[in-house]
Amino acid sequence: MAALPVFIPAESFPSILSHETLINHFRTNLPKHSSTITSPVRQNYTVSSPSSLLLMPSWSSSSSLPYMGVKLVTYFPHNSSQNLPGIHGSYTLFSSTTGQTLATMDGTVLTLYRTSSVSGLGSKILARDDSQVLIMVGSGALAPHLIKSHLAAKPSLRRVIIWNRTPQRAQELAETLSKDPQHKEISFDSHDSLDQIIPLGDIISCATNSTVPLVKGEFLKPGTHLDLVGSFSHEMKECDDNAIQRGSVFVDNDTAMIEAGELAGAFERGVIKREDICGNLVELIKGDKEGRKSSTDITVFKSVGSGTVDLLTAQLVHETYLSRC
């Protein structure tokens, strides 16, 4: 008799998963499995405008990764009037051998962990090893995960400065993180002028839905690593053309060159060409492409996510959960 599927709620993730563990899991398994995982273009259905349903399937052909899965996300922007989140998600994991349902887990938290850990891995490879100051641009749900991922990736970090359009939210996040005993060696504070703190950053991580450039290239100091997470459409952009022009630009996968406003816009305006993109995450991990070449290089890492990292995250969550039962 087959085992019953398990349900893994959001509250269980912190006891199952750490950002450092997931970063290492990606570093080991992305080169091994990226060519064996199929991730079709996500399907987006308008169910009643402006609300929508998104489906993101992926499956592996490797016997060492016998899984397939699908992330289902609902987007209901008017939920704020009911004091509810606008986005909800779940992830269902199946056996690719028998087709049996193995687990259903919270898709929103899975996405927060996988997105931030991809950024953490980019930082681990591209940021300077003596980086001390992290600037966090944005203070939404993803921000604390990004901060924890960068801290795990670069143990040299000693100070985190948070900026948000609403200064109070940045201050509240800084106060919350400063109470975390895991980060008692780290100084957390907030600032209301982004232009003033950008020159301080060794690593700058952005997670916003901005349609106007927030990070200006003129303020980036030599040696900075710029991590761009928020944009996923041509209308969105978190930095200006100067930042893209000054940096060595890397992507998590090639879809970023199509979807991300910072890159698609730069291509259209002739600021850079597609051939100027220095490599993707798998190429960096494998050493096929060179990352940082000197301590004064500015590196830019743009990520948009993929079904591949969703599946690898679900694999780790499921297998870790079972090992502890």
From Swiss-Prot:
GO function term, MF aspect, one: dehydropipecolic acid reductase
Record Pfam families: OCD_Mu_crystall
GO CC annotation: chloroplast; plastid
Transit peptide: 1-42
One record GO biological process: systemic acquired resistance
UniProt cross-references to Gene3D superfamilies, sorted A to Z: NAD(P)-binding Rossmann-like Domain, ornithine cyclodeaminase, domain 1
Induction of the gene: Induced by Pseudomonas syringae pv. maculicola. Induced by low water potential stress and treatment with exogenous proline.
Keywords from the named record: Chloroplast, Plant defense, Plastid, Transit peptide
Stretches that traverse the bilayer: none
Localisation per UniProt entry: Plastid, Chloroplast
Residues of the signal peptide: none
Family affiliation: Belongs to the ornithine cyclodeaminase/mu-crystallin family.
Role summary: Involved in the biosynthesis of pipecolate (Pip), a metabolite that orchestrates defense amplification, positive regulation of salicylic acid (SA) biosynthesis, and priming to guarantee effective local resistance induction and the establishment of systemic acquired resistance (SAR). Converts delta-(1)-piperideine-2-carboxylate (P2C) to Pip. Mediates reduction of P2C and biosynthesis of Pip in systemic tissue and contributes to SAR establishment. Does not possess ornithine cyclodeaminase activity in vitro.
Protein name per the record: Protein SAR DEFICIENT 4
Organism annotation: Arabidopsis thaliana (Mouse-ear cress)
Source species taxonomy: Eukaryota, Viridiplantae, Streptophyta, Embryophyta, Tracheophyta
